[in-house]
A protein has these predicted regions:
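A charged, well-structured terminal subsegment
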Residues: 105-128
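Short Gly/Thr/Asp-enriched flexible loops that form oxyanion-binding sites at enzyme active sites
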Residues: 43, 62-71
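Short beta->alpha junction loops
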Residues: 25-35
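Short beta-strand elements at the ligand-binding edges of bilobed clamshell
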Residues: 91-109
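Short glycine-rich anion-binding loops that position phosphate/pyrophosphate groups of nucleotides
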Residues: 56-59, 82-84
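Short acidic/histidine-rich motifs immediately flanking catalytic phosphotransfer sites
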Residues: 44-51
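Glycine-rich phosphate/diphosphate-binding loop of Rossmann-like nucleotide-binding domains
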Residues: 1-22
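Short, acidic/small-residue loops that bind anionic groups at enzyme active sites
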Residues: 70-87
Length: 128
């Protein structure tokens, strides 16, 4: 299976545990609707220090998500469970990634932990 066999609930639990281990607060959001994702990104402005995002298939199609990430100007890290670069040619462009400081792909759930740790370090260095 491209995305593995673990459940979305297991992923949420993993992210919460990874954030707690790193000593950071996390708010989780998931939607299959592009506009709702844009709204969530915009809502992060002034309330979050950074964003970890898996834009899924919108990675390759959504200029709206790219624009929202640019507009809020928060450091963002892109995560993909699978190695998108080894997949179909149409998956080679990441619009969201153009607004991100780092991308993790092909690491499964571990990519989220790496993204949290990277973002924490990035913010600490930026605020030093």
């Amino acid at each position: 299976a491209i995305y593995g066999s673990r459940s979305f609930t297991a992923l949420q639990d993993f992210i919460r545990a990874s954030a707690a281990e790193a000593g950071v607060e996390v708010e989780l959001f998931q939607s299959n609707h592009e506009g709702a994702i844009v709204d969530a990104i915009q809502a992060a402005y002034g309330t979050a220090d950074g964003i970890v995002i898996n834009p899924a298939a919108y990675t390759h199609t959504s200029v709206a998500i790219l624009d929202a990430l640019k507009a809020v100007a928060l450091p963002a890290v892109e995560v993909h469970l699978s190695d998108v670069s080894a997949r179909e040619p149409f998956r080679q462009i990441s619009y969201a990634g153009m607004a991100c400081v780092k991308t993790y792909m092909g690491l499964g759930f571990e990519g989220y932990r790496q993204a949290i740790l990277y973002l924490k370090q990035y913010l600490e260095e930026a605020n030093a």
